[in-house]
Amino acid sequence: MQPLHGNCLIAYARHKYILTMVNGEYRYFNGGDLVFADASQIRVDKCVENFVFVSRDTLSLFLPMLKEEALNLHAHKKVSSLLVHHCTRDIPVFQEVAQLSQNKNLRYAEMLRKRALIFALLSVFLEDTQFIPLLLNVLQPNMRT
């Protein structure tokens, strides 16, 4: 397993699933858990169909859609490197966006569809008070304390 040096990832556990952190810690998830994580803190195995990789550029496009006062909420504090949201229903578009995120040669329409689907997945975490600080830490790692 290789550590991911990059931006962030969204993982979806259809069944029980284990993620390995860079520090060797194991995190266990149940079926229906949607995870947003700092990709540099996760070791990803070859089973990447459960992951959507989100680039810094895509995250930067997501931020302007948020209210300015939301961005000022404790952006400097230390936060967990991952967040979990339990979904009560299956996420039918997850496999499509996972496939699109692995493809490097997307047509323009596919790129726009991928971005829109990633924004929809990111919006699931908006009610979590730790989401925006984690998002800002991913974008500006020098702010970590």
Please name every model-derived segment.
Residues 60-67, 94-98, 132-136, 144:
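Generic detector of well-ordered alpha-helical segments enriched in charged/polar residues
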Residues 1-79:
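N-terminal regulatory/effector-sensing and dimerization cores
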Residues 2, 41, 95, 99-102, ...:
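Residue-identity detector for glutamine
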Residues 85-96:
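A structural motif
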Residues 38-39, 45-46, 62-66, 111-125, ...:
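Hydrophobic transmembrane alpha-helix bundles
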